[in-house]
Amino acid sequence: MDSGTKVKKGAAGRRSGGGPKKKPVSRSVKSGLQFPVGRIGRYLKKGRYSKRVGTGAPVYLAAVLEYLAAEVLELAGNAARDNKKNRIIPRHVLLAVRNDEELGTLLKGVTIAHGGVLPNINPILLPKKSEKAASTTKTPKSPSKATKSPKKS
């Protein structure tokens, strides 16, 4: 053995020096999500929902939250475009959520601040079409034919 050369010993399983350091990649980037997986995991642990939290739970929850947010934003953007607006306001979010069947049931008990209410008029309160107005619009009768009596032969 050569006692002049010193061999560096690092921690087991780790690379000890040499190559360039790898840049850390977040779990959000690894999973292809925009929502913060690490923060959601921290909230799950801090909230004491369970003694232990698996590694896949925050990723799954972040994916679900991101999907719901994208769905609501898409429908609210459509509602804003229908109203000829470029900016989404709480009214557009309310219209989007309440007009969608599945989101409406999911967020049934939720109050959206400054959202207002859905426009709704009870059909009983709407004006009825009268029989006279309906008959005059269908076939107009001329008064000359109504006064003449049929000829007898």
Swiss-Prot record:
Region (Disordered): 1-30, 129-153
Residue ranges, compositional bias (Low complexity): 133-147
Similarity field: Belongs to the histone H2A family.
Entry keywords, A to Z: Chromosome, DNA-binding, Nucleosome core, Nucleus
Domain remark from Swiss-Prot or TrEMBL: Contains one SPKK motif which may interact with the minor groove of A/T-rich DNA sites. Phosphorylation of this motif may regulate DNA binding. This motif is reiterated in both termini of histone H1 and in the N-terminus of sea urchin histones H2B, but its presence in the C-terminus seems to be unique to plant H2A.
Cited InterPro entries: Histone-fold (IPR009072), Histone_H2A (IPR002119), Histone_H2A/H2B/H3 (IPR007125), Histone_H2A_C (IPR032454)
Keyword Cell inner membrane annotated: no
Biological role: Core component of nucleosome. Nucleosomes wrap and compact DNA into chromatin, limiting DNA accessibility to the cellular machineries which require DNA as a template. Histones thereby play a central role in transcription regulation, DNA repair, DNA replication and chromosomal stability. DNA accessibility is regulated via a complex set of post-translational modifications of histones, also called histone code, and nucleosome remodeling.
Keyword DNA-binding: yes
GO cellular component, one term: nucleus
Domain of life: Eukaryota
Motif (SPKK motif): 149-152
Species in which this protein is naturally found: Arabidopsis thaliana (Mouse-ear cress)
GO MF assignments: DNA binding; protein heterodimerization activity; structural constituent of chromatin
Protein name, UniProt field: Probable histone H2A.4
